[in-house]
């Protein structure tokens, strides 16, 4: 996560040892966009842990047989104070938002949306929109923005080639 604070506070990170153990968070199935929608495996938030650092949501979807499930069809909805990254492994999704962005994301690409003081967006990866679409597979991670920028400017960025 980018730290956009002008004067960030220094802090000491505790050193973990093997004695500290490892917490395994099991994902749960959640319908994305309603009860008859595509299912995602949501790891965060969970009953035992709502955050890991700045990460507040972690969803994995697919591989999903789009013809059987209808694919991803998330109607317009608002976000504030967070940033989302969508990384697609298989299929196509169309992102639309109130900033005027309309961007198709393909495998290996990223969409980065900064909600700031508020943005409304939708995501669609259906056979209706992409008739040749067979499967959909990807992840979406959300981070809580730092207090200094949480109500700042909104933005959308598409990364067509992710450096490896």
Task: Identify the residue ranges that each predicted region occupies.
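Ligand-binding loop in jelly-roll beta-barrel domains
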Residues: 115-148
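A short glycine-rich, His/Asp/Glu-containing loop-to-beta-strand
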Residues: 31-89, 138
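Catalytic micro-motifs at enzyme active sites that drive phosphoryl/nucleotidyl and oxygen chemistry
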Residues: 72-74, 99-101, 124-131
């Amino acid at each position: 996560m980018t730290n956009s604070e002008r004067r960030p506070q220094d802090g000491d990170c505790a050193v973990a040892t093997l004695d500290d153990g490892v917490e395994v968070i099991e994902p749960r199935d959640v319908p994305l966009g309603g009860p008859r929608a595509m299912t995602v495996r949501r790891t965060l938030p969970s009953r035992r842990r709502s955050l890991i650092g700045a990460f507040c949501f972690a969803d994995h979807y697919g591989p999903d047989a789009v013809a059987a499930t209808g694919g991803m069809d998330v109607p317009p909805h608002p976000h504030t104070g967070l940033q989302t990254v969508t990384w697609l492994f298989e299929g196509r999704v169309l992102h639309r938002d109130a900033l005027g962005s309309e961007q198709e994301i393909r495998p290996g690409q990223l969409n980065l949306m900064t909600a700031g003081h508020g943005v409304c967006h939708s995501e669609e990866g259906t056979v209706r929109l992409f008739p040749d679409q067979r499967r959909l597979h990807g992840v979406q991670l959300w981070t809580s923005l730092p207090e200094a920028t949480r109500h700042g400017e909104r933005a959308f960025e598409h990364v067509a080639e992710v450096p490896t």
